[in-house]
Every structure is written in structure tokens, then in C-alpha cells.
């Protein structure tokens, strides 16, 4: 990575931090904004075109309930336009899936990019089509300056920020908590005490899906934001401090409170290493004998619970805020998914425009497991109390909201299967005693990705 490119990554990280502060302020919604000149999917925008006989391909990493909920959005678009829409499952690595098709000259029309780092990489390589004329007015109207920044590269709009994520939640199995006689904790130490009680009750408390690694990076980011604070988090995100810094080692040591006790992990460490993310959810809520009682992951877990199990939110599943560590103030790690145009087709342009409207967002919001970054989507649009509470927690964190750190990194360090943060966090789960070695390996991988 050249010095000029590294500087763009640094500026990008700073901008995204500001964006999530804007989202925290706006997430309460409730404002009725005037219609802009860009139109919407239902009042004459591109998505209202007659696209009968055309096929639109959409690639995304969503699976299970998330894929089903997004399919409802695509079905609404198809009904409006007459287009046939094909969802392409990209597995865990979107870049690896669409890369060969781009190189072969046959990319899918639209890709749902799971982090700004992927958008930046694709745009820098010339693989994304600018969408200012497609959805610029809609982005300004419905997402505001923050949404424009998330979807932009070098001041050019390339993506529509469609789905936000509040990743600072801990989901728990309500009946197990009740039967074990424990209350939801507010601090890390209390959570470990609850875990011990649940373990004594006969249930291994923490369910972890670590076959790929990104859930482990989410855990690190939540711990680091609380132990090091927002300012240090920003510095690490920009690689202004090395991964061998004592603050990183402190966060890894805290994580080892769980990783270093395999009897607290559902099925033990080996089971966690073989369990995918959805499996870490269903092994708790899809069985009469739950394997696990707590899952440290984001708001989107709720949608998977209701979509893939018979469990009911509030009765069988609920969440508490990620706990304070050593008196840390409330803080939230956020994320998001961005729709980008890979092929400049009529159908692809129309779908991008549709995804920039509240009509599209409210379809998923009503089903659960979804937070919209649009300021024009009111909290009343959410079909369950869980979604509203997650959105409110994002709002209340204020200036302590930070974007998912791994998502801000060069893709080879922050979002690639088997390497960088994903791979090294898996290695740390295997060997949680090697804090120094893990920090050194993270620094080597980061330096290589940044071209240092």
C-alpha cells in the first residue's frame, strides 16, 4: 500500500467515526423530512420502471433468516418492476466470490458490501459504478451526510448504506437464566460470575461460532473499546499505534477470561472452532436442551432466532448491553452493509435506487433483526421491541459509538477468511495463553496490509 493510499485509509477511518456519531444522533428517527427531488421507488424513481423480462443478480453474504428477510425486500422490488431478481450467496467472503466474475467480465448487477473497507477496495480498483445520478438525491434525503460518507470513495458516491448493525449486545437464553436464578449482568466481572453459576447449573454458558473468525473480532472490538477507550480505538483503527501496544494486550487478556476456560464454552473450544455463526445461535434456541446460554453478538441475532427457530423474542431470547469493564462508560461498536453497483445495467440501477428508500428498509424493519441507518425510518416501523431497544442503545451511546474496527482495515487484514484479524483471532481462541505472540502476529499482518 502506497503512502498516499495509506493516508486515504487514515482519513476514511476518521470519517467513518464521525459518521457513526451522526447515526447515533439520528437513530431515534421520528422526523418527517420533505421529499427531495430524487424521487423514490414508488413515486416515479428508477425502481418504478417496467423491467419485465430483465434479470437482476444480487450477491451478498447473508444466509438463513437474514437472506430470507432480504429476499422479501427483493420480492417487493420484483413486484413493482416486473424484473426477475436472483440472490447469489457469496459465502463468508464477498470479494472472493465476485472477484472471478469481475475478472471474467460478468459481474452480478449489485453486491451487498459487508464493510466500508470492501467498498474502498472495489472503488479503488475501478470495480464499482458511481451512482450519483442513480441515487444521489435519495441518499441525501433519506441518509443525510453520514450515509453519503459511508457510501463514498474520494468524494464520489458508490454505495447505498442499507443496513446498520448495533454490535454491542449479549443475547441470552431467558429460561436458562430463570432456572439458574441469575440476573442479567452489567459488568464483565458480573457476567463471568453469571457464567460460573450457569455452568454449575449444568449448561456451558458461552456459545461461540468461530469457524471463520469475524465474531471473534467483534468481541475484541467491544472489549478494546471499553478497556482502552474511544480515542485509543481510533488510533488503533488508523494503525497510529502498533498492535503490540499494551492496550491491545490488555484487551486480549480480558478475552482470555472466556477463551482460557473451555468449560465455559458450549461444546468446548473445538466445537466453537467448527461452529458457524448461525450454528452458534441455533444450538441455543433450536433445542429443548440448549447448548449455551449467552451469545456475544449484535442486534441481527434476533432476526436469525425468529427466522430459524421457534423461539420467541422476550420470552425465550433477549439481550443485555455489552457489559462495562472496570467502570467503563456505555459504548457501542457498529457496522453496516452497503449496496454497490457492479454492472451498469438498467435493472441494477433501479434496485440501487429502491434500496435507498424507506419503503425498502421498512420491509425488513417490520420483520426484525434489522436497523436502518435512514433518518426517515421511524422507530415505530420496527416490528418488535428488540429492534427498537437496539436502535435506542445506539442513540444513547452518543460520542462513544465506533465503527467496527476490522471493517475499517485493508481487506486482507480485516475481512479475509483465514488471514489477518479473522485468522489470528481464531489462533488466539486455540491458544489464549499466547497474548504477546498474538499481538506480535497482528502487528506483522497489519504492517504488511498497510505496506509498511
Which residue ranges define each predicted feature?
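Conserved N-terminal structural module of periplasmic/extracytoplasmic solute-binding proteins
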Residues: 2-8, 27-120, 363, 437, ...
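Hinge/lid segment of periplasmic solute-binding proteins
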Residues: 47-50, 116-168, 192, 318-319
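Extracytoplasmic/periplasmic substrate-recognition and gating elements
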Residues: 75-76, 300, 306-371
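Periplasmic solute-binding protein
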Residues: 120-126, 147-186, 203, 209-236, ...
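Short, solvent-exposed loop/beta-turn-alpha elements that line the ligand-binding surface or hinge
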Residues: 132-143, 210, 227-251, 307-312, ...
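C-terminal capping/gating helix-and-loop segments adjacent to ligand/active sites or protein-protein/ligand interfaces
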Residues: 161, 370-377, 391-446
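Extracytoplasmic ligand-binding clamshell segments of periplasmic binding protein
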Residues: 230-308
Amino acid at each position: 500500500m502506497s503512502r498516499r493510499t495509506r493516508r486515504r485509509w487514515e482519513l476514511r477511518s476518521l470519517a467513518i467515526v464521525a459518521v457513526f456519531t451522526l447515526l447515533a444522533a439520528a437513530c431515534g428517527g421520528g422526523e418527517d423530512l420533505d421529499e427531495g427531488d430524487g424521487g423514490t421507488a414508488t413515486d416515479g424513481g428508477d425502481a418504478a420502471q417496467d423491467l419485465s423480462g430483465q434479470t437482476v443478480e444480487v450477491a451478498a453474504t447473508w444466509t438463513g433468516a437474514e437472506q430470507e428477510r432480504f429476499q422479501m425486500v427483493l420480492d417487493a422490488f420484483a413486484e413493482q418492476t416486473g424484473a426477475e431478481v436472483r440472490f447469489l450467496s457469496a459465502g463468508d467472503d464477498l470479494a472472493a466470490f465476485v472477484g472471478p466474475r469481475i475478472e471474467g467480465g460478468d459481474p452480478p448487477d449489485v453486491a451487498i458490501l459487508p464493510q466500508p473497507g470492501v467498498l474502498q477496495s472495489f472503488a479503488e480498483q475501478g470495480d464499482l459504478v458511481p451512482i450519483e445520478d442513480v441515487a444521489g438525491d435519495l441518499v441525501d434525503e433519506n441518509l443525510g451526510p453520514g450515509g453519503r460518507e459511508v457510501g463514498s470513495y474520494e468524494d464520489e458516491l458508490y454505495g447505498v448504506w442499507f443496513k446498520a448493525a448495533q454490535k454491542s449486545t449479549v443475547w441470552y437464553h431467558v429460561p436458562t437464566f430463570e432456572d439458574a436464578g441469575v440476573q442479567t449482568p452489567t459488568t464483565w466481572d458480573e457476567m463471568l460470575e453469571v457464567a460460573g453459576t450457569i455452568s454449575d447449573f449444568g449448561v456451558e454458558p458461552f456459545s461461540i461460532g468461530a469457524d471463520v473468525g469475524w465474531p471473534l473480532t467483534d468481541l475484541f472490538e467491544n472489549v478494546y473499546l471499553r478497556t482502552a477507550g474511544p480515542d485509543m480505538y481510533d488510533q488503533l483503527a488508523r494503525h497510529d499505534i502498533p498492535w503490540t501496544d499494551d492496550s491491545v494486550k490488555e484487551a486480549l487478556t480480558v478475552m482470555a477470561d472466556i477463551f482460557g476456560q473451555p468449560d465455559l464454552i458450549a461444546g468446548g473450544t473445538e466445537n466453537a472452532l467448527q461452529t458457524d455463526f448461525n450454528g452458534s445461535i441455533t444450538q441455543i434456541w433450536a433445542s429443548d436442551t440448549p447448548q449455551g446460554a449467552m451469545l456475544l453478538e449484535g442486534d441481527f441475532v434476533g432476526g436469525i432466532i425468529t427466522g430459524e427457530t421457534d423461539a420467541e423474542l422476550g420470552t425465550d431470547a433477549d439481550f443485555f448491553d455489552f457489559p462495562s469493564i472496570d467502570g467503563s462508560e456505555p459504548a457501542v461498536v457498529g457496522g453496516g452493509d452497503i449496496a454497490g453497483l457492479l454492472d451498469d445495467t438498467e435493472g441494477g440501477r433501479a434496485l440501487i435506487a429502491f434500496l435507498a428508500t424507506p419503503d425498502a428498509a421498512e420491509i425488513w424493519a417490520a420483520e426484525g433483526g434489522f436497523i436502518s441507518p435512514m433518518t426517515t425510518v421511524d422507530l415505530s416501523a420496527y416490528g418488535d421491541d428488540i429492534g427498537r431497544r437496539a436502535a435506542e442503545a445506539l442513540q444513547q451511546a452518543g460520542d462513544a459509538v465506533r465503527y467496527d474496527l476490522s471493517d475499517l482495515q485493508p481487506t486482507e487484514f480485516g475481512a479475509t477468511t483465514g488471514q489477518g484479524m479473522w485468522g489470528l483471532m481464531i489462533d488466539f481462541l486455540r491458544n489464549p495463553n499466547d497474548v504477546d505472540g498474538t499481538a506480535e502476529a497482528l502487528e506483522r499482518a497489519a504492517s504488511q496490509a498497510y505496506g509498511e
